């Protein structure tokens, strides 16, 4: 009967996961650049 409150946390979790992956990728790029340099 109330799909909105159920969808919001799922979307937040997905966005948090995507943000975490992006942060990990950025950190990996920074570490790789430091190692290469």
UniProtKB/Swiss-Prot annotation:
Topology within the bilayer: Single-pass membrane protein
GO biological process: photosynthesis
TM ranges: 14-35
Segments on the Cytoplasmic face: 1-13
Signal peptide coordinates: none
UniProt-listed InterPro entries: PSII_PsbL, PSII_PsbL_sf
GO-annotated cellular components: photosystem II reaction center; plasma membrane-derived thylakoid membrane
Cofactor comment text: PSII binds multiple chlorophylls, carotenoids and specific lipids.
Record key words, sorted: Membrane, Photosynthesis, Photosystem II, Reaction center, Thylakoid, Transmembrane, Transmembrane helix
Intervals, Lumenal compartment: 36-37
Subcellular location, record wording: Cellular thylakoid membrane
KW Thylakoid (keyword) present: yes
Family: Belongs to the PsbL family.
Complex and partners: PSII is composed of 1 copy each of membrane proteins PsbA, PsbB, PsbC, PsbD, PsbE, PsbF, PsbH, PsbI, PsbJ, PsbK, PsbL, PsbM, PsbT, PsbX, PsbY, PsbZ, Psb30/Ycf12, peripheral proteins PsbO, CyanoQ (PsbQ), PsbU, PsbV and a large number of cofactors. It forms dimeric complexes. Part of a photosystem II (PSII) assembly intermediate complex PSII-I; crystallized from a strain deleted of psbJ, it forms monomeric PSII before addition of the oxygen evolving complex. PSII-I includes 3 assembly factors not found in mature PSII (Psb27, Psb28 and Psb34).
Protein's job: One of the components of the core complex of photosystem II (PSII). PSII is a light-driven water:plastoquinone oxidoreductase that uses light energy to abstract electrons from H(2)O, generating O(2) and a proton gradient subsequently used for ATP formation. It consists of a core antenna complex that captures photons, and an electron transfer chain that converts photonic excitation into a charge separation. This subunit is found at the monomer-monomer interface and is required for correct PSII assembly and/or dimerization. This subunit may make specific contacts with lipid(s).
Entry protein name: Photosystem II reaction center protein L
Native species: Thermosynechococcus vestitus (strain NIES-2133 / IAM M-273 / BP-1)
């Amino acid at each position: 009967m109330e799909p909105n409150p159920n969808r919001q946390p799922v979307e937040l979790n997905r966005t948090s996961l995507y943000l975490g992956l992006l942060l990990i990728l950025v950190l990996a790029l920074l570490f790789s650049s430091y190692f290469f340099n």
